[in-house]
Amino acid sequence: MLFESQIRDLKMHLPWVRVRYEKTALRALDEQKRRIMTPEEVKEASHEIVARIEETQHFQNAKVVMLYYPILNEVDLRSLVTRYDGEKTFLLPATLPRHEMEVRVVHKDTKLVKGRYGVPEPPTEAYKGKIDLILVPGVAFDKNLYRLGRGGGYYDRFLRRY
């Protein structure tokens, strides 16, 4: 039999349990959808999204742009590095211990190395300067610019610093 205080505790935590479950379900659905995409579909979607990014004033005015390395059929933004290398400085994240990450400069000819989780990263030193535009991966975004990521919190912690 549950005591009154235990019932009160359960009621207080139920919304958080529901939110956690919904986030997990959204992440699973997103991963499932991305897994069934063909390479051609990923390439076409990436091309369309890159074109839209290039049209924005934010991108056009940015001198330093942070990207991400695409995994599991995420939108591939690497063509921006190829197209604008020398005109803009591009950064990619590198994972660190304690669920932290830093960013490093990448050029079109940079040879990437596998990072902590097998995701390619630049082997260069950490970039410490100003970042004008940060493009992040995400499962979902809302109109208030909140994002649902993959659940590790790397980008959340990183973005708090900017």
Regions found by a protein language model. Give the residues of each.
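N-terminal active-site beta-alpha-beta segment that forms phosphate/nucleotide-binding
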Residues: 2-4, 9, 13-129
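Active-site beta-strand/loop microenvironment that shapes enzyme catalytic pockets
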Residues: 30, 130-162
